[in-house]
């Protein structure tokens, strides 16, 4: 069993560092709940192995879905749900006890029958799977992702109680709350995925291939993270407001070249020299505390946002505008400074939406 567990930890860790940490913490929480319930040592081992393999099917999910930093679309969610059946197909012929396989097969089922893939309910769901569902969900609640904040320990415990009889077995929840109340959050597990592989993989999804800026998917989550950090920073928005006219006159290829030139100009005037792939790694790991460089996001067809942990001198921003005028395009920009001109995420979001609306854009 130990060899099997170690194999799956390494396999998952190489595919997605977050999933590895999620699995290790989930297994730890499941053990605590199982012991509180009075499971035998053999049952605990079966539960642990089931936890180690429960998400192995995610290695077959495309990066564009698995690593997405925002809520999945209904279509993407349907693909993500396949990880259960894919995982079972991957391991069903290995020497893994059926009780552990049941954890894999049924960990997404809900007590009220609204889960997947089979829609089982109540005690139709095997005991070990009912236990692991609670541990798995609790881990997700208390772990921060780029697109959501982590719930506090007490908030998560309260949610377990609120979902008793709906998502979770109401007879197990009191034991889970008692067991989990005695501890606090665990650190992320060690990431065995080589850094260069992570850079390539995440950059493939989050790096805009035309301009070299970070894709807009990461903009709002990063903005929220900077606000939550609580330290001063500056937000600058650049808009090429005559790009459509420019493209009609000079062609789309020339328009793409101009977009790239804008990012180059922003980098020269407003940003320190940094590998954007390193920046993406920091953003994905929520490691903004050590982020000392500006980050350029392409948030629309011709709009770019720059989040900087310092205020770029006004003349530097104006130099960007003048540089782009030499290339035949017109630039508008505005700056906001936290916590001087805004203090809340909703405030800056409203300003951004109004700006986009004013300029005839679709908005963010």
Curated annotation (Swiss-Prot):
All copies of domain GGDEF, residue ranges: 231-364
Gene3D superfamilies according to UniProt: 3.30.70.270, Hypothetical protein af1432
Segments forming domain HD-GYP: 1-192
Domain of life: Bacteria
InterPro entries the UniProt entry points to: Cyclic_di-GMP/3'3'-cGAMP_PDE, GGDEF_dom, HD/PDEase_dom, HD_GYP_dom, Nucleotide_cyclase, Rev_trsase/Diguanyl_cyclase
Pfam families linked to this entry: HD_5 (PF13487)
Name this protein carries in UniProt: Uncharacterized protein aq_2027
Organism of origin: Aquifex aeolicus (strain VF5)
């Amino acid at each position: 069993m130990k060899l099997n567990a170690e194999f799956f930890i390494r396999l998952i860790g190489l595919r997605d560092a977050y999933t590895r940490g999620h699995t290790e913490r989930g297994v730890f929480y499941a053990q605590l709940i199982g012991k509180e319930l009075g499971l035998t040592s053999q049952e605990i081992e079966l539960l642990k192995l089931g936890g180690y393999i429960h998400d192995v099917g995610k290695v077959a999910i495309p990066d564009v879905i698995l690593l997405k930093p925002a809520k999945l679309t209904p279509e993407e969610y349907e693909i993500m749900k396949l990880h259960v059946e894919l995982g079972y197909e991957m391991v069903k012929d290995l020497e893994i006890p059926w009780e552990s396989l049941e954890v894999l097969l049924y960990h997404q089922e809900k007590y009220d029958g609204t889960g997947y893939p089979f829609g089982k309910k109540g005690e139709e769901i095997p005991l070990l799977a009912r236990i692991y569902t609670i541990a798995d969900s609790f881990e997700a609640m208390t772990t921060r992702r780029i697109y959501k904040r982590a719930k506090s320990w007490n908030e998560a415990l309260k949610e377990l109680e609120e979902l008793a009889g709906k998502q979770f077995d109401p007879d197990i929840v009191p034991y889970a709350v008692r067991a989990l109340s005695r501890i606090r959050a665990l650190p992320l597990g060690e990431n065995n995925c080589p850094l260069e592989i992570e850079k390539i993989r995440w950059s493939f999804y989050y790096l805009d291939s035309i301009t070299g800026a970070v894709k807009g998917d990461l903009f709002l989550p990063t903005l929220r993270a900077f606000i939550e950090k609580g330290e001063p920073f500056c937000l600058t928005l650049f808009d090429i407001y005559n790009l459509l006219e420019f493209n009609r006159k000079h062609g789309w290829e020339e328009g793409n070249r101009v977009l790239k030139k804008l990012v180059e100009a922003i980098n020269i005037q407003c940003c320190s020299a940094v590998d954007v792939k390193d920046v993406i790694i920091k953003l994905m790991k929520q490691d903004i505390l050590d982020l000392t460089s500006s980050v350029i996001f392409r948030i629309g067809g011709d709009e770019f946002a720059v989040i900087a942990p310092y205020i770029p001198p006004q003349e530097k921003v104006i130099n960007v505008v003048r540089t782009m005028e030499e290339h035949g395009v017109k630039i508008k920009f505005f700056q906001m400074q936290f916590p001087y001109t805004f203090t809340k995420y909703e405030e800056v979001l409203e300003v951004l939406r109004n700006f986009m609306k004013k300029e005839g854009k679709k908005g963010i």
